[in-house]
Regions:
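Extended, alpha-helix-rich binding/interface surfaces that flank or overlap catalytic cores
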Residues: 1-69, 73-81, 88-168
C-alpha cells in the first residue's frame, strides 16, 4: 500500500476554506502519491476508500463539465459503472447518489459503446442531443452536487485514517 501523507497545517487551512478545498488536499495528495494519474497498476496500491475518493473526483469533474455523456466518452464509464463505486458510496451514506448511479449504469450498458466511439468534435457535441436520456441525471447531479460533495467530505473527515497519514 502506498502511504499518502498530508501536512496537518494544509488540512487545517483547507478546512477553514470550504469542503472542495478540504477534499482537494486528500485528492491531490493521493494523486501525487501515485504519480499523478490513477491506473490499473497503482490502483492496487490504494485502499478502497482512496480509490472511491478518486472516482468521486472523476465523476464530479466530468459530470459538472459535460455530463454523463462526457464521462462515458472520456473512457470512465467502466471505472464508474462496472465496479463497486456506487455500492461504496451507498455505504458512505450517499444513498441517493448510489441509486442514481445504478440507474445511469443501465443507460451506460445500453449506449456506452455508441458514446465511446471515436468521433469529431462536432459528432461529440451532437451526442448530447442523441442521448437525451442522460439529461435528467445530469441535472440531478448538478442540483445535488453540493450536498453530495459535503457528504463525501464528512465521510473523509470522520475516517481520515482510511485516506492519509497526517504529518506535523
Amino acid at each position: 500500500m502506498i502511504e499518502v501523507k498530508v501536512k496537518d497545517a494544509a488540512l487545517r487551512e483547507a478546512a477553514m476554506q470550504d469542503m472542495d478545498a478540504f477534499l482537494g488536499v486528500f485528492i491531490n495528495a493521493t494523486k501525487e502519491a501515485i504519480g499523478g494519474e490513477l491506473n490499473a497498476e497503482n490502483m492496487q496500491q490504494l485502499s478502497v476508500a482512496q480509490i472511491t475518493l478518486l472516482a468521486y473526483d472523476i465523476l464530479h469533474e466530468e459530470v459538472m463539465d459535460g455530463g454523463f455523456v462526457q464521462l462515458i466518452y472520456n473512457g470512465y464509464g467502466g471505472f464508474i459503472f462496472d465496479n463497486s463505486f456506487a455500492k461504496v458510496l451507498r455505504d458512505w451514506g450517499l444513498r441517493d447518489l448510489a441509486k442514481m448511479l445504478f440507474a445511469v449504469r443501465k443507460l451506460y450498458k445500453e449506449y456506452g459503446e455508441k458514446i465511446q466511439r471515436e468521433c469529431s468534435d462536432d459528432e461529440f457535441m451532437a451526442m448530447f442531443e442523441q442521448f437525451p436520456e442522460f439529461d435528467d441525471y445530469d441535472d440531478e447531479f448538478v442540483e445535488n452536487e453540493e450536498d453530495w460533495t459535503e457528504a463525501v467530505a464528512r465521510y473523509v473527515d470522520e475516517y481520515i485514517e482510511e485516506f492519509v497519514v497526517i504529518e506535523e
